[in-house]
Amino acid sequence: MINCIAYDVEVLRNFFSITFVSINSYLKVFKDCVDSNGKAIPLVQKLSVEEIKARLEKVEKHSFYITYTDDSQLLSMIDYINKTRCYKDSNGTIIRTDLYGFNSFNYDNLMIAALLSFYMRTNSTKELINKLYETSKTIISSQDDKDKFRTDFYLNSLRKYKLPFTGVDVMRIFALNKASVVVDSKTGERKPVPKGLKQTSINLQWYELLEYELPDINEKEAELYNEIPNLKGMNINQLNKLVDKWDRFILDEYIEPMMYYNLNDVFIVAEIIRLYSEEIKSRYAISKAYDVDVLNSSRSKTADILFEKFYSKFSGLAPEQWKGKKTERTAMSFKKVIFPFIKFKTKPMQDFLDECLKTTIYRVNKDAFSKEVKIGNVTYTVATGGLHSQDNPVELWSSGRELFPSSTGGQYDVLNDDDYVYIHADINSMYPSIIAAHKVAPAHLDTNAFCNLIGGLKNKRVEVKHSDEDTVDGIDRDTLALVLKIVINSVYGKLGFENGNLYDRLAVLKTTINGQLMMLMLVEELELHNIHVLSANTDGIVIKLYKRDIDVYNRIKDDWEQTTKLKFDTDYYHCLVSRDINNYLSQFRVIKNGVHKLKLESKGALNPMMYSLDLTKGYSMPIVAQAIENYFLKNKPVMDTLQEATNILDFCLTQNVGKQFHVEETKIENGQVTHVVCQRYVRFYVSNRGYIIEKVHNDNGSRSRMAAGSVVTVINSLDDKDISLRDINFKFYYQEAMKVINPIKLKISPKGKGKSKIKKYSGMYNPIFNEDDFG
């Protein structure tokens, strides 16, 4: 049995606290906060804020703190931590405690190790807190310096400390420690940028977006800084400018709000676990099934750990015999890249292939190689990063009411030869399939072992996908399916990762370039038989297929699969609404359990739930995507969706604000312009009356308006005010929706000169009269 607890540590100069929240209790209290399918949904979508707060009071929780002058809770704190040690109950059942935190792997766990190390080795609580504060500063100052963080003797000693509990870091599980990347302008180095707990809470639609803030230093607090040599004798204004909030002394009257802030953070961790429990559970299942430890691993890291285990088994080599190697390349000739069976039938494509064969490149980044080629009416870009067609926005609807045979289920015929469907031909696990079928492998690894491993995993994935059994090879089917998906999908990316064990840029090119050329072979053959391809990307194409052409299509498909040794599924669109390759919504015609259904898939600006699918993504007014979806799929006016909405958080926006900035509200009061400093992470919606919010550079004072200069209302702390009283600027959200709808309806790209055309013809696709008026 595992006792699951969320926790968080806070440290100031004269203050140390830990707050614990029982995950089991939290899940029980909010077990009814699910949708019609039983899937967990944000609390605000089910409960009022008043009800959320009332229920949070019922959750089992424990908070402890100590200060220079109050150590009354120290022994209780230590006792609580020690009781997380694994033990057997009276029935002989092993009881284990897992503590869940956010960035706890690199901070909170180390702080608890320091607490347990020093509490019996210091002469006073003040000395203990000073040690803990110094430890905190060391950890924080080292986190931007990877080498120091890994090699610091003191930090390494804390890492080796045997904690009584098992730590689980949700930040690492969801890859929030590497949520985005910035490129150093001087060195060109790509540096990961983490996403903090407050930013993440916005994606959860958490009701309380609370940053830790203390009132300005007053006279009472200022006296305490005389103990600090470099601050001694400074006046209050100087102290307020120089002392960071985490380097403050906390006065007794500020402890209660501090503990509330701490508790709110822990509740957010608990909410992540509630909303994404399957992802958390998968780490336990994988760890148990494969005897590995992935409790603190993202999917990418999990793939590394599993690949190491699998490859060592397939090759017969111990990890230390093959890890740490890579293959460096200088010049890479496409003559060594392109497979010999790549052939084209038309002169333009033959010339294109000849050009490719003469190419030599020296790197594999996006701009290393790029060529355009036209087949039929579509222009395609072939590049190191993948194939894509140069598409205008489209709205496509299949005719008839019935289906062709589909890999997603069911078999029906369209009505007559002139009926057509738009189909998506999708290559099954394209890159892994190329690797396995055509023996593509890093030169420093055993080719047969590598390719047989990838091929075996791919085939096993197909078996698991179609299995009705609860277990496959003695492993839970869902766990095995996830393992196979994680490892297979990661392999190609690892080939191009310079610091990884699979690095070989020639293997990257053999996979991507041949994949694109094989796709173009298929496109050419279809166009030669008057079957038109409308769009293409790396592993799939969109085709308009008439019933009369189905036999020709199947013959071309079979021949192509035999030549390339690849397989593809054919899925049938009911509709496809696309702004571009990364922003679309579609409905597929499927049959499930004998019932005709439409399966919705959407992405980017057309997916109302994009913010919840990937916590590394930002959060931007999901109501707009919902209005766009309703407009196309339900023929519902945009303004109707906006005005019928009940959740104000669906209208909210946020923007990333770097540490070099702070945020200010600019308002006019009694004819005077005033600037009020806000917390750095703000959640706001565009309103008719409100304030302008700006990013202000801490050093030079430069200002940058947020929300495109619109007036907004900040709503960091949600209340139960009726949405009709929120003074929402519906015109703003309507215009944002039309920025997506207009290009699609007009079939004009919003890039370049298309912007002016869209503005000129905006709304001109709407009929003046309803067709029903004419009988």
Language-model features: locations:
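Short His-Asn-centered micro-motif
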Residues: 7-9, 68-70, 101-104, 425, ...
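C-terminal, non-catalytic extensions of nucleic-acid polymerases
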Residues: 338, 343, 384, 392-393, ...
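Short active-site loop/helix that positions an aromatic residue
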Residues: 107-118, 428-442
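Two-metal-ion RNase H-like nuclease active-site motif
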Residues: 2-11, 169, 423-425
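Conserved DEDDh/DEDDy metal-dependent 3′-5′ exonuclease domain
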Residues: 33-196
